[in-house]
Amino acid sequence: MAKTLTIDEMHELLEELETNYHLMHSDELPELDLYMDQVVTYLWDQIGGLTRRPGEDKILTKTMINNYTKAGLLNPPDKKKYNNDHLVSLIYIYMFKNFLSISDVKAVLDPVREACFTEEEREGKAPKKGEEEKKAPLEFTKVYDVIRDSLSRGKKELEKNISEEIDSAAETFEDADPSLRPMLQQFAAVCRISADIYMKKLFLERLIDASSDSYSTTDT
């Protein structure tokens, strides 16, 4: 039988999530480049707490990394080694792919990647002999740090919003049978939070479409 959580237990679940939520600053990333197995282990250790079932769910596999590279989401490794730009890319991909399709993830990352990496870097090609080495206008890890710091500042507000949704759910079904009230209030919390997630996801999808060169609102 499914377990119903009380309002207090839902707040405790949120507090547990708050404790596990941490995105490392670029200064915390490894000083040395890593092989693929090391990348998988490192990200498991660093962001494993952000999975649905910490300690059980996989962050990524070697097959996933290869597929992301083939899809143009990840720069090819240098002599089978991955640097901090690769790690940051994988963090973005992991977070986005939970609610966006891979094609949408690519659409989101492509403009940033083009500003942070030269074409040679994105394709894993060495500069031609005698040709001056090109440099991208932005540094990928610095962009990440700005985003990461912004998320950290907004974390409390996000937590507060979820907490308020739980409290609002606690005010519903006050006249219901006491034996059914916790289940109904949990359902109300799920519906309220789901509606919020749905609207944000829909906005993201429409934002991506509106920003895509291939998207058109013209009827065919």
Regions flagged by a language model, labelled:
Residues 108-111, 115-220:
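Intrinsically disordered, low-complexity, charge-dense segments enriched in Lys/Arg
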